[in-house]
Structures are given as C-alpha cells and as structure tokens.
C-alpha cells in the first residue's frame, strides 16, 4: 500500500493525497494581467479529486515585478476579485490552492515593463541573463526593501482572494534566485558577497510573508541545480545548505524543491541529488519534490527515495492533459499525452480546458452523486 494516497497535514490543510499540481506558466490571463474565466475552469477541473493541493502558475507581486505578457498578477482589486472566483471554484471541489508569488527580474521583457508603467529591468546586479540579453540595473537597498514589502502585500492580497496560502518563487532564475546565486549576484554590500549576504533577500522576503499571513500559510520553492535562465553557480551546496538551515527555522507549511533533471520546462540529463539540502533542512516540514514524475516514479519517491520525509510529489505537465490525475495514478489509468504546442498560447482555451476526464472517473463521480 503506497503512502501516496494517505492523508498529510500541511500548514492549515489536510491533504487527502500526496500529489500536488506543480506551478506552470500558461499565459491565460488578460492583457491587464487579470485571470480570465477560463482560468477558473482550468483550476476547478484539476481540483476534482478532493483533498488535492494545486499551486498556481507564477503570479506577479506588483506591476514593476512583471514583464511577461498575459501572466497573472495579484496586486490590484480586479486581480484579487478574479482570483477569488478561482479559489471558490477549487474549494467547491474540496481541494486546496496556493498562489506562487513571483518577481521576474532580469528575464523580463524591458519593452513591456516600459509600456506598462515605465519600469526598469532590474536584478541583484547589472548582470545579463545571456550575452545577447539586455543588462538589468542593480536594485538599490531602498528599492530592495520596497520589493520585500511588495511580497508581503501580495501575500495579504492572496489571503483576501481566498488562497489557502502562498508559495514564494525562489527558483528557476527569477529575482530571488538572482540574489541567491553568485553567477548573477556580484554585489559587495549586505545583499551579496557571501553565502549569508546572497541568502538575505530570500530570507527577508520569507520573514515578511510569514509576518503578513503566517508561517502555516507560506511555502517556498528552490532549484539548487537548475541551469535555467543563466543559473547554476559552480557549487550550489554551501549556498543552499545555508538557506535550508535558515528556512527550517521559519516553520513554513512546506519547502518545494526542483530536481536536477528539470531546467525550467525542459527535461535534462542530470544526476545531482537533493540529499545535501534535506540533511540541512531536516524534518522541519513536508517537502514537495518536482521534476518529471510519472505515476510509477511518484510512488517510488514517497515510498522509497524520500520515505524518511513527509514527501509530496509535484506533477506539472501531465496534469495539463489529465485533470483527474490523482485518480488515474491511484487506479492505474494511463495518462493522456499533452500537446506542448498549446502550453503558452495566450488566452486560448485549446489545450487548456478541453482535456477530458477518464470514463472511470466520470463513473465514480456519478456513483457518488
């Protein structure tokens, strides 16, 4: 009997299974970064197995933190109201939903930032994401504190929108990761120059969010091994060991780790393990593991590979084409393949809300009615 379908207490939630929907950018918000009605349908469909945790796509904490067209935000009243429709629909299915709080930093589109408010392209340092990319401006210390306040306000907005909690996006080469890793952060002030200095932004953001909404409504995501968007410091272990130790002290709802075999949305050949982080973090909270999992490897992760931890498996792309995914895993029903060509088509329901539930799931729902 696998632990994958045994309950687990996470923060303020009582999950019925240990499969979470991992965060995935889909660009189905309006041009003003307001969630469209199809987003409500999309998340409600994937909440259909009661007691499942969904983590939203990356959602910008403020207008200046954006720079991606048709990505949602959580910084104004229209966005909060639209997200409330989403969270109500998810809760009506008996499931849970966290919003992923996001500041883009140097990979943002500078033209879009200018058009949407005259905002600069910024980062920890004036270090471009690649040789042919624009060079960002380094944030001043005064600005850093203002951005930390943006995270806290976004967390409060999330609770107002009905979210069960928030996940701080500290992974995949976005702004927090740009402070964390020395491949980007070349600062010599208190926000860089050492393991402690580089970790400071992530930890100050975490503390501010915890103060705003509570540790039991806060998670954080790290990707120590990812090469996505110019990341991967030479030896990430000391940096992320320190973050693990310090994060463990905060008593968060969970920590979310990206396996080395995933770089952004791509599969890569990699064998670097997360054991070093887990040893430093201990058993401070449940841990979500994400990275190319299928039904078989998800069972192995919770029962064997991470059996000593309260492990949750984050599954992304297969959840797109299998809205009843936890039911399929539990009942040995094959996954429907996804269509990568529809992943990022702005505002389009095709490949978004048109994937069917399995016949077996539909029968189970009818029988329970």
From Swiss-Prot:
Cysteines paired by S-S bonds: none
Instruction: State a single Pfam family of this protein.
Output: Oxidored_FMN
Residues annotated as coiled-coil are none
Q: Please provide the Gene Ontology terms (biological process) for this protein.
A: indole alkaloid biosynthetic process
Active-site residues annotated for this sequence: 174 (proton donor)
The annotated subunit structure for this chain is: Monomer.
Q: Which GO terms describe its molecular function?
A: FMN binding; NADPH dehydrogenase activity
Q: Which domain of life is it from?
A: Eukaryota
Manganese as a keyword?
no
Question: What protein is this chain from?
Answer: Chanoclavine-I aldehyde reductase fgaOx3
Q: Which family does it belong to?
A: Belongs to the NADH:flavin oxidoreductase/NADH oxidase family.
The primary gene name is fgaOx3
Catalyzed chemical reaction(s): dihydrochanoclavine-I aldehyde + NADP(+) = chanoclavine-I aldehyde + NADPH + H(+)
PANTHER family xrefs:
NADH OXIDOREDUCTASE-RELATED, NADPH DEHYDROGENASE 2-RELATED
**Enzyme class, first EC level, given as a word:** oxidoreductase
Binding sites annotated in the UniProt record for substrate: 169, 172, 344
Q: Per the UniProt record, which EC number(s) apply here?
A: 1.3.1.100
UniProt function note: Chanoclavine-I aldehyde reductase; part of the gene cluster that mediates the biosynthesis of isofumigaclavines, fungal ergot alkaloids. The tryptophan dimethylallyltransferase ifgA catalyzes the first step of ergot alkaloid biosynthesis by condensing dimethylallyl diphosphate (DMAP) and tryptophan to form 4-dimethylallyl-L-tryptophan. The second step is catalyzed by the methyltransferase ifgB that methylates 4-dimethylallyl-L-tryptophan in the presence of S-adenosyl-L-methionine, resulting in the formation of N-methyl-dimethylallyl-L-tryptophan.
Protein's pathway:
Alkaloid biosynthesis; ergot alkaloid biosynthesis
Q: Which residues bind FMN?
A: 23-25, 58, 100, 169, 292, 316-317
What keywords is this UniProt entry annotated with? Answer: Alkaloid metabolism, Flavoprotein, FMN, NADP, Oxidoreductase
Please name the InterPro entries in this protein's record: Aldolase_TIM (IPR013785), OxRdtase_FMN_N (IPR001155), Oye-like (IPR045247)
Enumerate the cofactors the protein uses: FMN
